Every structure is written in structure tokens, then in C-alpha cells.
Amino acid sequence: MVPTKHQKEGGAKVEWEVLEGWGLIALQGPLSADILGRVMVEPAESELKEMYFGSSKFVKIKLLNGEVSSPLLVSRGGYTGEDGFEISIPESEAVVVTETLLQNAGPEQLQLAGLGARDSLRLEAGMCLYGHDLDDSTTPVEAALSWVIGKDRRETGGFHGSEIILSQLKPKSKGGAGVERRRIGLIVEGAPAREGAEIVNDKGEKIGNITSGCPSPTLGKNVAMGYIKDGFHKSGTDVEVVIRGKKRKAKVTKMPFVPSKYWKGTAPS
């Protein structure tokens, strides 16, 4: 394996600790920073403003019973496309931390949400669900995730799958392998498309499959994600999706369907 630039230059040592039995809650939405800030022990405004998407830190909060929580690992991010925080909590405090947030915010500002709500949000945000939109046979290039492959990796290679992936990054017109299929978003007319539905061209020929789909509460339209034959992947392309034996009109659409609102140092629009 070819060493990366970081390895060549002697990167710093990394230590980690496995947090066994911890729970996780995701505080998501435009009021999440305000709600978390109200219960933090330390002054929250400056700390949270400097905590950008993808960063994390340990914080303590004031619990309902007047006690102070153990250090909680708070990461700014989530699986909804909204600003928010994923909070890792020791098992013994998972319930009281959740109740503290709920009661402090009140039902008009914060409510519990299940997997159905999370799934529709992540699909609106164009996020993949492993085992559905991704599996161990999918490459980052096919999945429209080439941005995860850093410049250093592209130059040195040597990572698992690099021979195939680096070849796919170069289009066929420039001597590369390109890809045969690409992950795309779709707006579907009529009934919502579900996983496994076939995507066909105007001749009725199969050109792809749906991997996720649902009605979008935000848009009031049916959104879907899937893989389509290279060449049909451009935004605005008209196709059809076979739903319960009937062909429904669909249009290839850029993702995210709903603009993401991650905190990057400026107020989300």
C-alpha cells in the first residue's frame, strides 16, 4: 500500500475510548442551538456559534432535578439536512437528559420524532441509507460521493478499491473507465415510488431502480432516489417509474431536494 502524505510526514498519534452502552439522541431543527443553549452549564452562545457542522465537544447540562449531567459528547450534525446536534449520553442519564430538553423547550418547540420522520428528512436532504442506497458493491463515484475522496488519496492511491475508483473518476472520453450507473434524485408524479421500483425510458426499457422513495412533507411532492444508466442522469431528464404495474412520469432532479441548513458560521437561510 502506498503511504499517504500524512503518513509520510509522521502524523500525530490518535487515542480513542470506546463508550460502551451509551445512548444517542438527535436534536434537530432551526431551534436546536437555542434549546441546547438554554440548559448548558457553561455560557452557550459563544460556544455554539464556534461549533461548526462536523465538530464535537463534551458539554454538561442542567438536569430537571437540579443536578448537573455527566459530560455529554455533542456533535454538530445529523441525518436530516437541518442544523442540529447528535448527543451521546451515558445509559443511566439518557431518559433524564431527553426529558430535560423536552420540558425546557415545551411541545410547541420540541417533540419526539420516529424513524419515519427521520427517513423522510434524510431523503429530502439527499442522504443515503446504507443497505438501500449504498452497499459494499457501490463505489463513491457511482453514488455521487466523489467529494469524500481527498486530493491526497487521488494522487497516491493505495486505499481499498483505489484501482477501480480512480479509474471511474476519469471519464471514458479521457481514457478512464467512467461508470455504468449513477445515483440520482427523482420527482415522481402520482403515487410515491418505493424501493425496488423500476426506472424505464420512453421505450419501456429498464434503465435503473429506485432505492428509496416517499412523499415529501416539505415539498408536497413524491421524491425518490435511485440508480440510473449513465447518460440518463442529467437533471431535467424525463423518465418513467413502474409503480404497481403502472408507469408514472418522473423527472431527474438535483439533490438535495430541500436545501441543507448546516451551521457553517453564518445563519442558515
Residue ranges and their predicted role:
Residues 1-269:
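Conserved, structured C-terminal
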